[in-house]
């Protein structure tokens, strides 16, 4: 069955679900304690398969299905890592040659709600910087993760994944412990035309 890709029209800010609460501290005194939200960092390494953002999107998929959304499972396994970055202020006019693909060990996995890969970002480049409203301008949502790891020739393990930078107008690697928002995507099954 054919499907239509939907890319959320807003970035979920990296501080979503984060809060400071006035609590009793270990020493018995009271003070503010910061609690991280579910997507404050990509994860412990550049592997989307085991990332905090993928875990969160799995929960989102379950919630959406309970609300009646019928989303397709999409192959989100990695076949490539990338090196390089697009030029700042190039936005959707970036050159694909600035990003170099490197074959990677294949990961078998599917998701119903997911982040775009670098390959998909290239394919849907005209949509990467389009939004409804101006909410993305707040500091916690000025860039959003892609699911592709930054690699290196001959191996992985860089501790970086790619992100779309909305202010600088580029696609670039970011340390996985750094803060980026997320822009979920999903595919809805389309009925065959008659």
Q: What annotation goes with each model-predicted range?
A:
Residues 1-194:
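Collagenous Gly-X-Y triple-helix signature in extracellular proteins
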